[in-house]
């Protein structure tokens, strides 16, 4: 594959463009002169977050990218957005997925979905802001419209999944990857944040993005 010319990083739920992994990728890519963008999914309102809005923001970021191969790097819920964005935008020619939340399941942070539906909002801890914030049930309703398992993705995909992930079931990721020969799944001994695997993730992503040959 040709070297990627532009990378768009899609951060996870209750995270931000200042996440440690986003910052690491931006710094490393700058050494190669690769342009970088990271939409802020907390804006204009975290409370009103939906997958559809995240996809719209990703569309705008892809549209603003320089000409040439574009890679999406998605973390957790950002990875869910990345796989759906990839089928919508031909400019995207490869994906890196980090602990991909391929379905919302029981909701974020051990949410009681029935209670969330009844009250219309969920109180969660926002890691980037280090405080509790509300998010509306519209996030869960909207996410249910999107099925990552039904997507026909032909582009190369590199996936990193922790075997000790407490938020994303590793078996779900393995099942998603099993029927897709274009997916290179790397299981690592790590938790959801993949903090202990950042060096390995960059090393393999560097090659996958065409920046360093084996």
Please state what every model-predicted region is:
Residues 2, 64-68, 152-153, 212:
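Glycine-rich phosphate-binding loop signature in dinucleotide/nucleotide-binding domains
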Residues 2-43:
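Short, surface-exposed "cap/lid" segments of acyl-processing enzymes
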Residues 9-13, 73, 98, 160:
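Short hydrophobic segments within beta-strands
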Residues 29, 85-89:
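Aromatic pocket-lining residues of Rossmann-like dinucleotide-binding sites
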Residues 47-65:
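Alpha/beta-hydrolase active-site loop
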Residues 73-82:
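Gly/Ala-rich beta-loop-alpha elbow adjacent to hydrolase catalytic centers
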Residues 91-214:
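The alpha/beta-hydrolase serine catalytic core
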């Amino acid at each position: 594959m040709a070297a990627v010319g532009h990378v768009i990083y899609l951060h996870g739920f209750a995270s931000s463009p200042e996440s440690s992994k986003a910052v690491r990728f931006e710094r490393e890519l700058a050494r190669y002169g690769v342009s970088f963008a990271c939409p802020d999914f907390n804006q204009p309102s975290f409370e009103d977050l939906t997958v559809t809005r995240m996809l719209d923001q990703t569309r705008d970021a892809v549209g603003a990218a320089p000409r040439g191969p574009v890679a999406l790097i998605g973390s957790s819920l950002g990875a869910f957005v990345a796989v759906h964005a990839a089928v919508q935008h031909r400019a995207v020619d490869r994906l890196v997925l980090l602990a991909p939340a391929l379905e919302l399941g029981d909701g974020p942070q051990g949410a009681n979905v029935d209670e969330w539906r009844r009250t219309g909002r969920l109180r969660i801890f926002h890691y980037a802001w280090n405080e509790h914030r509300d998010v509306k049930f519209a996030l869960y309703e909207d996410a249910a419209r999107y099925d990552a398992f039904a997507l026909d993705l032909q582009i190369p995909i590199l996936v990193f999944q922790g075997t000790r992930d407490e938020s994303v079931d590793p078996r779900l990721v393995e099942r998603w990857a099993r029927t897709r020969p274009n997916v290179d799944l790397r299981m690592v001994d790590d938790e959801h944040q993949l903090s202990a695997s950042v060096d390995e993730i960059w090393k393999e992503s560097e090659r996958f993005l065409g920046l360093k040959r084996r």
